[in-house]
Amino acid sequence: MTHFSQYFATLAIQDSVQQAQDTSKKNIQRILAHGRPQTLADFAALISPEASDYLEPLAQHSRRITQQHFGKTIRLFAPLYLSNECINICRYCGFSRNNPIPRHTVPVDQVRTEAQKLAQQGFRSLLLVAGEHPKHVSNGYVANCIRECLPYAPSIQVELAPMETPDYEPLVEAGGEGVVVYQETYHEATYRTLHTAGPKKTIPGAWMHPSGPMPLDFGG
């Protein structure tokens, strides 16, 4: 499997920064007339300071693309927090293990009760959230939570620490629909200052997974 870090290393980010600084209004007009950016340089031009005079055309174009793919739909989901147990130390996160806070993992039967209450409020899509802790947040626990929530929320995603493909399989079998993974920064020096202990401290391990929402069956 090709890690994202390997692909990222091939991107000439500083070149794109320079292209954004050097772009012209004529170039931005050309890109807008074409319909959408065709290259990374085009995208850099559209987020450049020179493009500030074209915010309304950009907004209208973005609106057309959004409606083309999703229609006039707003999908709401409710986060359901399963556990704040975590073995990582991350400077920005409330779950960080060095934070002096009470730790709790919600029992599965209480998770079911919470899902039922959210369904009564109209939510049909849930995001199950937990910190990274192999003892308290195991595959079996999360899979059981998914099963208990399904009668009340047919669309369930999870926000957990990145795992290998086989570890996601029980979540798929339980009825999970998607997974959300965040990469806080791709700037290595900044990453190291933000993640000081735990598995997440290792950059290659964090970069080997795609960033953002993806289907839970992405591994086949």
Question: What does each model-identified segment do?
Answer:
Residues 30-33, 37, 64-71, 95, ...:
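Generic secondary-structure signature for well-ordered alpha-helical cores
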Residues 59, 63, 75, 87, ...:
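Hydrophobic alpha-helical segments
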Residues 97-114, 118-220:
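Core AdoMet radical
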Residues 49-50, 58, 79, 83-85, ...:
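Surface-exposed loop/turn and secondary-structure junction residues enriched for glycine/proline
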Residues 1-77, 88:
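Flexible, acidic/Gly-rich N-terminal and inter-domain linker regions that tether
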Residues 61, 81, 162-163:
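Short beta->alpha linker loops
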Residues 71, 75-110:
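Canonical Radical SAM [4Fe-4S] cluster-binding loop centered on the CxxxCxxC motif
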Residues 11-17, 23, 86-97, 205-220:
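Short, charged N-terminal helix-start/capping segments
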